[in-house]
A protein has these predicted regions:
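Generic detector of well-ordered alpha-helical segments enriched in charged/polar residues
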Residues: 28-29, 33-37, 41, 141, ...
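Alpha-helical scaffold segments that mediate packing/assembly in large oligomeric complexes
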Residues: 111-196, 320-324
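Sequence/fold signature of self-assembling virion shell proteins
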Residues: 2-51, 56-74, 95-97, 115, ...
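Structured, hydrophobic secondary-structure cores that serve as assembly/anchoring elements
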Residues: 61-66, 72, 85, 92-120, ...
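Short Gly/aromatic-enriched secondary-structure transition segments
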Residues: 80-87
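Short, catalytically relevant binding-site loops at active-site mouths
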Residues: 146, 215-219, 260-262
Length: 324
């Protein structure tokens, strides 16, 4: 009797050319897991704007990484033959808990696998990775917005209000961006104010970033300086991880994201900060392949775990804006 499915001759873990029950041993879950993570890291804005040094220390959901915050050392003047004052070191312990998880699961039918020219492994891997990225970015960005210092120092400019003004104060109104009516705050001026607030807290200039939704970048492109024109960006479009420019603007690496949570009344919100402000840890914990008991196909599923903690609230600034 002739075989309907030919045994796989794939020696490169090419999932789209192999069938479980035939010669499917070339599909290795560990290789698949690395493939997902590779797509993920190329897409995630959060990976680019947070401290990921602790990612290698997690191995399971619920893991906790203890972080010792750097002590502040006082400097005093010195006069010859006099005693010097000393600083007693105090350590502050912070926890980064991996307490969030997302999963993906899909089925690759045997017939689709063998009869289609589409590489289902690549298509499904890319789709799963971008879905994980969206969920991860949205959750961590929301936590970062919540973690912005709102007193001593107050780094929240405006509020989620439909009423706007041009003062850029920490009041109940949102910021009125310069629009078609010719009035309001230039988007670049708002960025300059956010940079100054970071300067006031001695936040290092190297490693600063700015993230905003597309509506803000539309206003920024119409700014009087035209700094985001094609000429400024050397003819390049979006590069990777949401980075929108090869150069810095007001000292910030510029990122664009659709995963900033929607506002209730304002047109949108933006955030700026330093890469040391927030620690994150994430990993593709496991992937599995098993036969679907109800059809002829393979179930592929994976588990992504992560955690985030705002370590330096003073190194974040947020602002709410209204576009006329």
């Amino acid at each position: 009797m002739a075989q309907f499915f030919e045994p796989s001759t794939d020696t490169n873990a090419n999932f789209a050319n192999s069938v479980s029950g035939q010669a499917n041993s070339f599909f290795l879950p560990s290789i698949y897991s690395k493939k997902v993570l590779n797509f993920f890291r190329k897409a995630s804005v959060v990976e680019a704007i947070t401290n990921t040094d602790y990612a290698g220390e997690i191995s399971a959901f619920g893991d906790s990484v203890k972080i010792i915050k750097e002590p502040v050392i006082s400097v005093s003047s010195y006069t010859r033959n006099t005693d010097t004052s000393q600083t007693m070191l105090t350590d502050q312990e912070l926890n980064l808990v991996v307490d969030q998880a997302n999963a993906f699961k899909f089925i690759v039918d045997d017939i689709e696998t063998n009869m289609s020219h589409v590489n289902f492994k690549e298509v499904a891997t890319s789709s799963a990775a971008y879905s994980l990225k969206d969920a991860y970015d949205a959750a961590v960005l929301a936590e970062m917005f919540t973690g912005v210092s709102s007193s001593s120092p107050d780094h929240v400019i405006g509020s989620d209000s439909a009423t706007a003004d041009s003062t850029m104060t920490h009041a109940t109104n949102s910021v009125d961006l310069l629009g078609s009516d010719g009035t309001g705050v230039d988007a670049l001026d708002l960025m300059a104010r956010m940079a100054r607030l970071l300067d006031d807290q001695s936040v290092p200039e190297e490693g600063r970033w700015f993230v905003a939704p597309p509506s803000f970048y539309e206003e920024l492109s119409q700014s009087g300086s035209k700094l985001l024109s094609v000429d400024f960006n050397a003819g390049q479009g979006s590069i990777r991880n949401g980075l929108v420019s090869t150069g810095k603007l007001r000292g910030f690496d510029m990122y664009k994201s659709n995963n900033i949570a929607a506002t209730s009344n304002a047109s949108g919100k933006v955030m700026a900060g330093h890469i040391s402000s927030t620690a994150t840890a994430q990993t593709i914990l496991s992937t599995e392949v098993l036969r679907d008991p109800t059809s002829f196909g393979d179930i592929v599923r994976g588990l992504h775990v992560y955690g985030a903690n705002v370590l330096r609230p003073e190194a974040l600034v947020s602002a709410f804006y209204v576009v006329d």
